Amino acid sequence: MKLTTVLALSLMLTASAFSQSTSSELKELKDAIAAQQQQIQQLQQQVQSRDSAIQQLQQQVGQAQSAANQAQSTAQSALGGEKKEGAMSAEEFAGLQHEVTDLKAVTANTVDGLQDTQKRVSDLESPLALHFKGITLTPGGFIAAETVWRPHATFSDINTPLNSIPFSGAAQARFSEFYGSGRQSRLSMLAQGKWGTTNLAGYFETDFLGVGTTSNNNQSNSYVMRQRQIWGQAGFHNGWTVTGGQMWSLVTETKKGLDNRTEATPLQIDAQYTAGFSWARQYGFRVTKNWHNKVWLGMSVENAQTLLTASGNPTNFLIGGPGTGAGLYNLNANYSSNASPDYVLKVAFEPGFGHYEVFGIASDFRTRIYPNATLAKPTAAGAFNNSIWGGGFGGNARWLFYQKHFETGIHYLGGKGIGRYGNSGLPDVTVDPNGYQKALPANQVLASLEWHSPKWDFYGYGGGEYVGRTWYGTKPGGLGPVGYGSPLFNNTGCGTETLPTASNGYGPGALANCTGQTKSVVEGTTGFWYKPYNGPKGRLQIGMQYSYLVRTAWVGYGPLVTVNPPPANPGSATLAPKAIENMWFTSFRYYLP
């Protein structure tokens, strides 16, 4: 009985202690929750106080404006009415005018205060830039995940080499290709500051479309960052602006005056843009003048380069060489030895409806000629330099309709020696039998249609590039044609597949008996961008593109002519090879805010 009593008392004491402990823990938990709720309420009160202050300022603005309007009305009535007994005296009228002036000043100050408050709130919630030592830094760019599918392989990732899509006889034309890539991801930084009345700016932009010596798709898919743009700028209050560095060429169309960073580039995914788009990114030193945001005049000196294509020519000329190991140029690329930079002059107009541009290009092409290179005993004696000038004229026009939702534009560039400014990279020059350069006639045209809305962008482009032929029937020694686009060149093998050239499976055979020099490249492109989110946290963007591309070569003849003189009429056995690509692209991007 005693044992039972002891056990009962023990259980009661334990239960009591447990109950007290549990009650204590519950009380502490309730106190913590209450404290958190109090903090939340305080934060809510702060937000409500801020909103209330803004509303009060808005009400004050409305009241002040109403009072100012009423006082102004009274003053006007007093001024225009007839003087009657008890009417307002001159002193009273002057006092009323003074009151109106004071009310207007109060209204202006209140509006400024409201705008300043709203701006500070916006800057705190969503800062658009960083401030560092008196300058403003604005980061930008996007992260991209993109794919491309082509029915005929080009081995070129997310950009399409328009002048290299394969003819039907090429092995790569017999199978398709799919690639995924994040290399078009882009990073940029804009730095801005003021020096007195002068606006200073610097801009840097990069992507990952460069190729290193160890880059491949085997495992890590590591590709290198490259320079897209890097320039500095000084803008003066009198409308003059000076810009220097690597930038879009002044040839490239802009959407606002001649301002950098307003270039009218196609919206598509393909990193090589579209046929007919004229552009370059290269060193430039540019000076522009702005008259009242209506007329702009710009002039730039830019890096020069010569693109040459010639067939059948002897080795009696020189225009440059490959990069050297001790220098900073690519060992696998050719560089022309330029006598001078390229010169571009442009005028832009914005009369009130539309944006219009007229421009011209001038290029100096230099050659080292060896007149005795074709003798029975060749010698470099008597070699000399020779230069020719090339260039052209172009124009752009762009219009906005339907509350700026619908945008359309047209571009044209024509001349001689302007091939490299076209998107397809067609040649600038060829050579005659004696080694003299001859500038090739060329034309580039592009039409664009775009539809813009907060959620959707739709686009369509149609363009083409053409390069004329310049050829000569014989070369020193009396055999074969020389130049570009000759109907006597052999194109009979452009549709015949050849055997691989390597045993490792990565050596597609080169076409035999296929000169295949390009006459024109024509492309039609359409696509869309969808933006499920576009706000202070950035922009999410999804897109798709389809392109139809046709590359047509100059008519040729085969086999190679070995008689002198060559036949005046190549006959009915002429061949104009054609290559066609149907391409699909997809893109998933996140843009920095």
Indicate residue ranges for each PLM-predicted region.
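Sec-dependent signal peptide recognition
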Residues: K2-L9
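Sec/Tat signal peptide C-region and signal peptidase I cleavage site
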Residues: A15-S19
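N-terminal periplasmic/intermembrane-space "pro-region" immediately following the signal or transit peptide
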Residues: Q20-S156, L499, Y506
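Outer membrane beta-barrel
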Residues: E125-N313, S337-H355, W399-G409, G414, ...
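Outer-membrane beta-barrel translocator domains and adjoining extracellular loop/strand segments
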Residues: A153-D157, T214-Y223, K255-T262, T309-Y335, ...
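Short sequence motifs at beta-strands and strand-loop junctions characteristic
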Residues: S176-G182, S222-V224, A275-W279, Y335-S340, ...
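Detector for outer-membrane/organellar transmembrane beta-barrel domains
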Residues: P351-G524
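Outer-membrane beta-barrel "beta-signal"
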Residues: K578-P593
